[in-house]
Amino acid sequence: MGSQPTNSHFTLNEQTLCGTNISLLGNNRFIQIGNGLHMTYAPGFFGNWSRDLTIGPRFGGLNKQPIHVPPKRTETASIQVTPRSIVINRMNNIQINPTSIGNPQVTIRLPLNNFKSTTQLIQQVSLTDFFRPDIEHAGSIVLILRHPSDMIGEANTLTQAGRDPDVLLEGLRNLFNACTAPWTVGEGGGLRAYVTSLSFIAACRAEEYTDKQAADANRTAIVSAYGCSRMETRLIRFSECLRAMVQCHVFPHRFISFFGSLLEYTIQDNLCNITAVAKGPQEAARTDKTSTRRVTANIPACVFWDVDKDLHLSADGLKHVFLVFVYTQRRQREGVRLHLALSQLNEQCFGRGIGFLLGRIRAENAAWGTEGVANTHQPYNTRALPLVQLSNDPTSPRCSIGEITGVNWNLARQRLYQWTGDFRGLPTQLSCMYAAYTLIGTIPSESVRYTRRMERFGGYNVPTIWLEGVVWGGTNTWNECYY
């Protein structure tokens, strides 16, 4: 039997609590008072590690001297604990349930979410070449691309000697020739930001995923649903651009970032204006459709990665949502794939976890990442100082310490062996990079629920993962993983 109190102030004192057990439960965090006012509290309320406090004598009445307990107040339910009483303010949505007469116990249940959830929405106008909101499911992941001029500038700087940065330039030209608005080098105006979706990039790199059936179904559905004769060409050329970016060390994660989760849209001809949930609970945002007022985050099944399952970790507890790029850097076999990963590990530990799972790719990139890079051919311009050879050769130029520290030290230095390091062809941080990840949200639930089911998409059944209770909002900072 339960009752809903209407008062906004509730006090439990010693006479009320003597000989009874009272538990305040809310999302597995509680205050429990037993015989003699023996109390335990958990960090959900007081911000401390759980400990036992004896407010009164445990076995001998209320006349003995109690131990002083400083007042404590929570941020969620405004509970004040003193040596004489427990005061609960704002009693809205709090239930008091007596369990039985033989075992007197009162349970006060706090609502799981007694705070206002704020959701931040974001809008973007874009062409529909890489993303059609009328085709995608509401709640799908939307990504935003930087301008192609930024990629070309980075390619001219970061491409190693021996590799051609014009490969990326040619790939971008071919890609935008198959789009609605062709782009030329040096053009800075026009629509600067393109948006795309997680399912579109997964369709581009369908051959990279281990779940071949789900990846092929997603690609076929994308081509069929978009209904454009050049859609297959766009997917192929977008994939070639991603491979060229890896070859030139202009990694895609530096130019593709998380935008939000699709909520609403307007579309006309080849332009669309989308509204996405950028921060806050996904289910808290409402759509203008009466049939689906609330939407749940969903992704293609081929891109989903349960890292905790692969690491044999516990499936319970809060989960972090990461966006992960995985790179293969072998010459002419460059690979890119994008995952949405779930893990209870934080940002620091997550990198070590995927480094363990991607050990083979990490080793291959370190061994083969410098293929095609120009090596040095100058015999007197070596990578390392030949100290042993110079010491064993009696004819090598030498000078005393006095000459080096004297007035004419510059003349003495010119007589010595001139060495300049040349590190071309050696592995670098960029050539060894195998992954990059960023935190984009959390699932703050004790029991995380995700469901895999078949969804109708473009006339085809596509395996889809639905994530419940996602709260978007991360650092939007990419962490790069290299050997």
UniProtKB/Swiss-Prot annotation:
Compartment(s): Virion; Host nucleus
Main localization (coarse): virion
Gene Ontology terms for molecular function: DNA binding
Annotated InterPro entries: Herpes_1 (IPR004999)
Domain of life per record: Viruses
Subunit comment: Interacts with TRX2, MCP and capsid vertex component 2/CVC2. Self-assembles into homo-oligomeric amyloid fibrils. Interacts with host ZBP1; this interaction prevents host necroptosis and extrinsic apoptosis. Interacts with host RIPK3.
Protein name: Triplex capsid protein 1
Species name: Varicella-zoster virus (strain Dumas) (HHV-3)
Lineage: Viruses, Duplodnaviria, Heunggongvirae, Peploviricota, Herviviricetes
Gene for this chain: TRX1
